[in-house]
Amino acid sequence: MKRLVSAFLAGAMALSLAACGGAASTSTVASSAASGSAAASETAASDLDYIKEKGKLVIGYTVYEPMNYTDADGSFTGFDTELATAVCEKLGVEPEFVEINWDTKVVELDAKSIDCIWNGMTLTDDIMANTATTRAYAKNAQVVVVKDGTDYASTADLVGKTVVAEAGSAGEAAIEGDEDLAQADYVSKSVQTDCLMEVAAGTADAAVLDLTLANAMIGEGTDYASLKIVDELNAEEYGVAFRKGSDAAAAVDAAFDELKADGTMQALAEKYDLALAD
């Protein structure tokens, strides 16, 4: 069929592509990943087979140090980046990291724009009810971050104040579930790092976000030296989410077992200052 495409149509396609701009957007990359694997989807007997037939695991993430981020040398790295790469080696596939909108992560997962959500994702009741998840692999907590010098005794001090969190995140859920924080002026942001920017700039009084990110990005020697953790709201754990009913989650659990046994996961936890789940 390709031989029958006319020069007119080829030109039209070129104009259409040019109108889209230069660099590919996240949605463009995700759409390409989904369409490029259509044949595998039709023939695969299971979700794991589908992934293996494609030869790659498409991983949805947001920029989040120390889990998935670009370091000073320009290398894409992080605890989850390295762990996912090690798991993919066990599965015999290549990792492909696609930046997503965290608030629509399950929608992108179900649409097969991505194969999994692997980005310091809290194992909430909602996630576990709507996806197939791995066992917990790392510990975390939701914390309150404010500017140094801010008077803070409890979440009651934030009633009526501006509080930010990432849309669709465990931080947002923590705000909604706290009697005092629920009375704050809540503003959602696209990513957790934007929350730190708002507090540092003084446009927000506090942020609720992951302890792992706060430990990596605030305090002495960081870009956010003026910020500090003042409260820990709740303990939680991270896991990886696949499509509901997927057998790939169990395969990743098996890979985790091997990577724990050979010391890989502990070495990564020490490298990125994280605590592995029990």
What are these language model-derived features?
Residues 40, 45, 170-190, 225-229, ...:
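Ligand-binding clefts/hinges and TM-proximal coupling segments of bilobed small-molecule sensing domains
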Residues 121-129, 174-177, 200-201, 205-234:
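A ligand-binding cleft/hinge motif common to bilobed small-molecule-binding domains
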Residues 42-120:
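Extracytoplasmic small-molecule ligand-binding "clamshell" domains
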Residues 17-37:
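Bacterial lipoprotein signal-peptidase II cleavage site
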Residues 28, 146-163:
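Flexible hinge/capping segments at coil-to-helix
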Residues 81-90, 162, 169, 215, ...:
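Extended ligand-binding regions for polar small-molecule ligands
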Residues 139-146, 211, 215, 219-257, ...:
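Periplasmic-binding protein-like
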Residues 89-90, 98-99, 103-117, 130-132, ...:
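Short helices/loops that flank or line small-molecule/ion binding pockets
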